[in-house]
Swiss-Prot record:
PROSITE patterns: SUBTILASE (PS51892), SUBTILASE_HIS (PS00137), SUBTILASE_SER (PS00138). Residues 1-16 form the signal peptide. Alkaline protease that allows assimilation of proteinaceous substrates. Acts as a significant virulence factor in invasive aspergillosis. Required for regular sporulation. The lineage of its organism: Eukaryota, Fungi, Dikarya, Ascomycota, Pezizomycotina. Pfam families: Inhibitor_I9 (PF05922), Peptidase_S8 (PF00082). The gene is alp2. This is Alkaline protease 2. It comes from Aspergillus fumigatus (strain ATCC MYA-4609 / CBS 101355 / FGSC A1100 / Af293). Residues 17-136 form a propeptide. Keywords: Allergen, Glycoprotein, Hydrolase, Protease, Serine protease, Signal, Sporulation, Virulence, Zymogen.
Length: 495
């Protein structure tokens, strides 16, 4: 199997290195793995301790490549001794990453003996076995029903009069960059109006194109002219999944790093006066797999660096806390709702789910032509509603270079605000440990302060109060009537 190789039992010839691995390390670093993820054979993510700086990280990279090369030489010698039959060489260092200094490390394809040496290195916090991730779409339902935008702009359940009416501020998304960390984007689609561009392709030897459609669909919901929440946002394709819709955790981490660095450069350029009108960045990650400490740390680090993040809760009808990045603390984790205001049958739930958004039968942009559309379902479709909402609200702030710039709307504050103004109690089939919150965009207002000041809204609270009042009145009248009847019976009996 090319690239995925079985482990060798040969001893490792350790090469000279610029660092010493000895007793100053307090025990070997742990190797983490997920019980509910498909591991990529012989592939690992190595995370450094907090004290590691750029210089020591570079020295470590050189060291690990030295011992990796020595191992490959031993493999080649063994192949010759066996007349060409033996294990193939390992691929070595793949990606290095540094996400705003909060998560530093690297990934690669290594022999187990190399990993044992790495475990003993004093700079290593932990090692995680690389695993597969995949899109969060549910492909079993395909019906055309573009209702999601209307739902997030109305408080009450959609009716015939509100079914296709999306209320929004026309400037929504302007000055905001949205990173779609997914399968790519059909950047030439007419619905993007030239606002979509290719950012980065992470998988090795892959093309700069969306061969799957999933990333394009999510991008349309974020910022499409017709299908998008934030219709003027800029889109950047960060391809971490191949056309099959699957990829590796290590590639996703590398994609997050690229998006964070791109965002931080924009922030610096805006403050230096090199660009005008930039207001901030958001990211959507409609993918997931088993629990991964590294992936959650990467997303959390991205949020800490100022990148507003939405992630899908997952489609297993299970506790979102058992999946990554859904279980990460800092992003907004999104479950899926239906047109009938139910929790979608596939949507994950639990305390790690922050909010719900439309995710069943969502119409959006697709691949194959500049005009292609498709209707698919999943928490993958719910998450970009929130990513679009993040871009929408960020755009209602003054730009970073503006004389009217106010205190920064941090990801932590915006997450809190979106949860605070959500429609409460609108959904059915919500477990008791899950927030019953449905996303709301402010109903077309362009005044962020007023939107937040309006607070949350409990569906049909007044109707419920009136109903309870009528019941109380009926009970009172019935009691009085029964009392009168009893008195008449009593009087008749006495007479």
């Amino acid at each position: 199997m090319k690239g995925y190789l079985s482990l060798s039992i040969l001893p490792l010839l350790v090469a000279a290195s610029p660092v010493v691995v000895d007793s100053i390390h307090n025990g070997a670093a742990p190797i983490l793995s997920s019980m509910n993820a498909k591991e990529v054979p012989d592939s690992y993510i190595v995370v450094f301790k907090k004290h590691v700086n750029a210089e020591s990280a570079a020295a470590h990279h050189s060291w690990v490549q030295d011992i990796h090369s020595a191992q490959n030489e031993r493999v080649e010698l063994r192949k010759r001794s066996l007349f060409g039959f033996g294990e193939e060489a390992y691929l070595g260092l793949k990606n290095t990453f540094d996400i705003a200094g909060s998560l530093v490390g690297y990934s690669g394809h290594f022999h187990e003996d190399v990993i044992e040496q790495v475990r003993k290195h004093p700079d290593v916090e932990y090692i995680e076995k690389d695993s597969e991730v995949h899109t969060m779409e549910d492909p079993t339902v395909e019906k055309s029903a573009p209702w999601g935008l209307a739902r997030i702009s109305h408080r009450d359940s959609l009716s015939f009069g509100t079914f296709n009416k999306y209320l929004y501020a026309s400037e929504g998304g302007e000055g905001v960059d949205a990173y779609t960390i997914d399968t790519g984007i059909n950047v030439d689609h007419v619905d993007f109006e030239g606002r979509a561009q290719w950012g980065k392709t992470i998988p090795t030897d892959d093309e700069d194109a969306d061969g799957n459609g999933h990333g394009t669909h999510c991008s349309g919901t974020i910022a499409g002219r017709k299908y998008g929440v934030a219709k003027k946002a800029n889109l950047y394709a960060v391809k971490v999944l191949r056309s099959s819709g699957s990829g590796t955790m290590s590639d996703v981490v590398a994609g997050v790093e690229w998006a964070v660095k791109s965002h931080l450069k924009k922030v610096k350029d805006a403050k230096d006066g090199k660009i005008k009108g930039f207001k901030g960045s958001v990211a959507n990650m409609s993918l997931g797999g088993g629990k991964s400490r590294t992936l959650e740390a990467a997303v959390n680090a991205g949020v800490e660096a100022g990148l507003h993040f939405a992630v899908a809760a997952g489609n297993d009808n299970a506790d979102a806390c058992n999946y990554s990045p859904a279980a990460a603390e800092n992003p907004i984790t999104v479950g899926a709702s239906t047109l009938q205001d139910e929790r979608a049958y596939f949507s994950n739930y639990g305390k790690c789910t922050d909010i719900f958004a439309p995710g069943l039968n969502i119409l959006s942009t697709w691949i194959g032509s500049k005009h292609a559309v498709n209707t698919i379902s999943g928490t993958s479709m719910a998450s970009p509603h929130i990513a679009g909402l993040l871009a929408y609200f960020v755009s209602l702030q003054p730009s970073k270079d503006s004389a009217f710039a106010v205190d920064e709307l941090t990801p932590k504050k915006l997450k809190k605000d979106i949860i605070a103004i959500a429609t409460q109690g609108a959904l059915t089939d919500i477990p008791s440990d899950t927030p019953n919150l449905l996303a709301w965009n402010g109903g077309g207002s362009s005044n962020y302060t007023d939107i937040i000041a309006s607070g949350g809204y409990k569906v049909n609270a007044s109707v419920k109060d009136r109903f309870e009042g009528l019941v109380h009145k009926a009970e009172k009248l019935l009691t009085e009537e029964l009392g009168a009847i009893y008195s008449e019976i009593h009087d008749a009996a006495v007479a």
